[in-house]
Regions:
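Structural signal for the C-terminal ends of transmembrane alpha-helices
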Residues: 20-28, 59-62, 128-137, 162-172, ...
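Alpha-helical transmembrane segments of multi-pass integral membrane proteins
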Residues: 189-313, 335
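Membrane-interface junctions at the ends of membrane-embedded or membrane-associated helices
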Residues: 24-32, 166-180, 237-251, 272, ...
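Juxtamembrane transmembrane-helix termini
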Residues: 7-41, 48-68, 161-167, 267, ...
Length: 336
């Protein structure tokens, strides 16, 4: 079993890595391209955030969330019952959407708490690249950022940047990571740490398989982040994993992953919960849980595809246009 926090940490570490790659190495893109990436980042993330937050508000107003009733049956309080617990007026909703979209929309759609980290973590990554990527002091800057941000999820982005720098600039790093024994060792160790529980009382944690591990409070995300780093190290040099991850079905999941992540909890809190309660007295707890889960997958994937097609793709096009306009403005000023 993987901890849910592990997937979040992997997402953040991978973001720092991927966002940095093209700005490091021998043929790195220049500062104008980096500026364009900064300019368009907000637009890239805003489409699905604003849309799914609005969907969450509509479902709240229509009283179509059944998470409280499900939490009482399953014992998943307070986690599940705390969701959508805020009674928002239309004015308060619009205020959040206009002024606090990247900090408070999680009251409308809980997974959106990560998107604020993603935006500002991206800016942190781009800022470090802008000021330090061409200097020999950049690794000192990375270390300083890790110290200043200790205990924060923003460390994940710095770690991703650090790994990208090593991968692009350190001689022999790619060859070493491509060795099957090295990659497999990192991957196995990372997957073992991926199960480290995020939220357990100390006495329960001590009795788990991870109870012998010392506290890792200085690292945001703890062992979930460490596991994410190791999984990335075990993946980037693996030829067979690259072939697997580029298969059509896996590539499709990657294409709709942002839309799926942004919408899955809305489905679970509404349709899944409603269907579970409807079936509970008819087929029992286990049967209703299984059938509701299977039916939810039938809803989630088409919904994610629709959001990708009609929201995410236009957001990508808009952000690309913003980047092109930024570069055109820079070029026109340089010629003046």
């Amino acid at each position: 079993m993987f901890s849910g926090r592990f997937t979040v940490c992997l997402f953040f570490v991978l973001s720092g890595f991927v966002l940095s790659l093209r700005y490091l190495g021998v043929v790195a893109a220049g500062n104008p391209d980096l500026g364009a990436s900064i300019a368009k980042r907000t637009f890239r993330l805003a489409g699905l955030l604003l849309t799914t937050a609005t969907l969450g508000y509509v479902l709240m107003c229509a009283d179509l969330f059944f998470n409280n009733e499900v939490a009482a049956v399953t014992g998943s309080s307070p986690w599940f019952s705390y969701m959508w617990a805020t009674d928002l007026s239309l004015g308060a909703f619009l205020h959040i959407l206009v002024f606090d979209a990247f900090s408070k929309t999680d009251v409308l759609n809980p997974p959106l708490w990560t998107i604020g980290y993603e935006l500002y973590g991206s800016f942190l990554t781009f800022g470090l690249l802008l000021f330090f990527r061409k200097t020999r002091l950049r690794f000192i800057a990375y270390a300083a950022a890790l110290v200043l941000l200790q205990g924060s999820y923003y460390q994940c982005f710095v770690l991703g940047l650090f790994l990208a720098d090593i991968y692009q600039n350190v001689s022999g790093a790619r060859e070493w990571l491509s060795r099957p024994a090295v990659g497999a060792s990192f991957l196995i160790a990372g997957l073992l740490l991926a199960g480290s529980p995020a939220y357990l009382p100390p006495e329960a944690l001590d009795q788990s398989a991870y109870g012998f591990l010392p506290q890792l409070d200085m690292l945001g995300g703890g062992y979930s982040t460490l596991g994410a780093v190791l999984v990335l190290l075990g993946t980037i040099g693996s030829a067979w994993l690259h072939r697997f991850l580029t298969r059509p079905a896996i590539a499709f999941l990657g294409t709709i992953s942002f839309a799926l992540y942004s919408s899955h909890m809305l489905v679970q809190g509404s349709f899944t919960s409603w269907l579970f309660l409807l079936l509970l007295e008819r087929v029992g707890y286990d049967g209703s849980a299984l059938l509701a889960t299977m039916a939810s997958l039938v809803v989630m994937f088409p919904a994610a595809w629709l959001l990708w097609r009609w929201v995410d793709v236009p957001a990508i096009r808009l952000s690309s246009w913003v980047g092109v306009q930024f570069l055109a403005r820079v070029q026109s000023k340089s010629k003046a």
